[in-house]
A protein has these predicted regions:
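Conserved active-site-proximal loop/helix segments of enzymes involved in bacterial cell-wall
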Residues: 32-38, 91, 157, 201-209
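Transmembrane beta-strands of outer-membrane beta-barrel proteins
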Residues: 18-20, 77-79, 176, 182, ...
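Conserved small-residue
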Residues: 54, 68-168, 208-209
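Extracellular/periplasmic, surface-exposed regions of secreted and cell-surface proteins
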Residues: 1-113
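Strand-loop-strand
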Residues: 99-102, 187, 193-197
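Extracytoplasmic gating/loop element in the C-terminal half of outer-membrane beta-barrel translocons
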Residues: 141, 194-211
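Short, glycine/acidic-rich beta->alpha junctions
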Residues: 3, 57, 61, 166-177
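Active-site proximal loops enriched in glycine and acidic residues that flank catalytic Cys/His/Asp
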Residues: 11, 23-26, 159, 189-195
């Protein structure tokens, strides 16, 4: 179920040469179809069923602006730009009972990336011995030193936290372009981009395994 509110404004100036539109929206979706995760064992089900148990909301804005300038009866040019900004937040996804609040998806963007917090590099063997134990392999001086977020003396998957701007969905998309027209000939260009998005860069792989 989706409930969306939208408000916008548009205008034209200078004999319709300059035109723009801007919209703002707020969208709430509930009863999202998701797999259950908290059914008790006495339910007696072999496979966990799906149900309408999710809720999230999104908000944002989009707009465009253009300017058309006739030079003479045969020539003219037009420049334009547009943008779309959108943010989504999980309000309630059924989840396991996590030991730490930062492990939950609720209250955070959908598909947010998680990772360890790097505090620098180990400078000596003595620093390694006096630091929380890093559980991802043997550590040597020069290796990355990760933060023990929960303070239990070891660095493991329980210390993975949501990363700033760590969202696999672009929050901002934009573009701009221009056209030049002479009689029946039009030459133009268009540039598009996205921002506020991150991806994990996976390692290289060959026949022997990960490099």
């Amino acid at each position: 179920v989706s409930r969306k509110s939208d408000v916008g404004i548009e205008g034209k100036f200078f004999k319709d040469r300059l035109a723009f539109t801007v919209d703002f929206f707020y969208d709430v979706r509930d009863n999202i179809y998701r797999q259950r995760v908290t059914l008790p064992e006495y339910a007696g089900m072999i496979t966990i069923p799906f149900s309408n148990v999710g809720k999230m909301h999104s908000y944002g804005s989009d707009g465009n602006i253009s300017y058309h300038h006739p030079i003479n009866k045969d020539m003219s040019f037009t420049v334009r730009a547009n943008y779309t900004f959108s943010e989504n937040i999980v309000d309630n996804f059924e989840e396991p009972l996590y030991a730490y609040g930062y492990q939950s998806s609720n209250g955070k963007p959908l598909y947010i990336l998680r990772g360890l917090i790097a505090e620098g590099l180990f400078k000596s063997k003595e620093e390694i011995e006096t630091s929380p134990e890093q559980m991802f392999g043997k550590v040597r001086p020069g290796d990355i030193k990760y933060r023990d977020v929960n303070g239990d003396g070891v660095v493991n998957n329980d210390d993975r936290v949501p990363l700033s701007y760590g969202n696999q969905l672009p929050r901002l998309m934009y573009g701009f372009g221009a056209d030049y027209t002479w009689k029946d000939l039009t030459i133009g260009f268009l540039f598009k981009g996205s921002a506020k998005v991150e991806y994990y860069r996976s390692g290289l792989y060959n026949d022997s395994g990960w490099i």
